[in-house]
Amino acid sequence: MHFDIAVVLFVIMNLALGVKMNLKNTLLAFTTWTSIGNSNWYITAVLGMYLIIILAFSVFRKHKLPALITVSVLTVVFAIVLLKVGKPEWYYNTLLLFPVGMWYAYLKKHIDKFVMKNNLTYMFFMVAAVGLFTVCYRIKGFGLPFYWIYACAFMMIIILITMKVKIGNPILSMLGRHVFGIYILQRIPMPIFQRLGLNGNNMLYFFLCFAVTLLMSAVFDMLMKKLDKKLFA
């Protein structure tokens, strides 16, 4: 529902700017399948993964292992479907990280204990992850499996860093609370400021877009919370 309300804002913006829209594409934009200027691929991916998880855990319920295997297999199928219907690569090239993250959570206690056994073991895995990332960066264009390995290697590096370093501050926390609003609304100020000719100064354009996006996302999230309370309280 929040996504569709955001799409309505894009419809209003396009009408105000005189951007042409056809009915079919506009209606499909409300399903996340197409776009009228809004970001949509991430929502398509998340909705698909939610459906896969609901299906897997509805069938296997408390049996986590077969549910995880099912999620992994269906994620690969989902990625292949998106590839075959002609969706851009960013729709599916990081999908596998979702079940990989679930596997890590499932085995976290054992993985962390083994990796953090001593500094030598930790450095071995860090060097291996960085090496794999570097190699796969050069060959990631050879096919989806190579990109998945590249993406997983990057995720491994981040996980290994967070095993040693705690990352967090009020700014990151604030951005995390408003991540959906920022993601979905960021493309509204961009064309408006472009139309006003403010994109001639890159720094001014960037900071204006960033500031307005933050303000819009904060207001949007506040209004959505109030709407949710009225509808679901």
Regions flagged by a language model, labelled:
Residues 50-74, 103-123, 198:
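Solvent-exposed interhelical
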Residues 9, 24-34, 50-59, 78-84, ...:
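Short juxtamembrane and helix-loop transition motifs at transmembrane-helix boundaries
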Residues 12, 125-230:
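Alpha-helical transmembrane segments of multi-pass integral membrane proteins
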Residues 1-35, 49, 114-125, 174-184, ...:
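Transmembrane alpha-helical segments and their boundary/interface "anchor" motifs
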Residues 30-45, 81-100, 132-157, 202-207:
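Interfacial loop-to-helix transition and helix-capping segments at the boundaries
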Residues 35-41, 59-66, 88, 114-118, ...:
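Short, amphipathic, aromatic/basic-enriched membrane-interface segments that mark the entry/exit
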Residues 80-87, 104-114, 159-167, 189, ...:
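Juxtamembrane membrane-interface segments at transmembrane alpha-helix termini
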Residues 17-18, 61, 82-86, 194, ...:
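Short helix-capping/hinge motifs at transmembrane helix termini and TM-loop junctions
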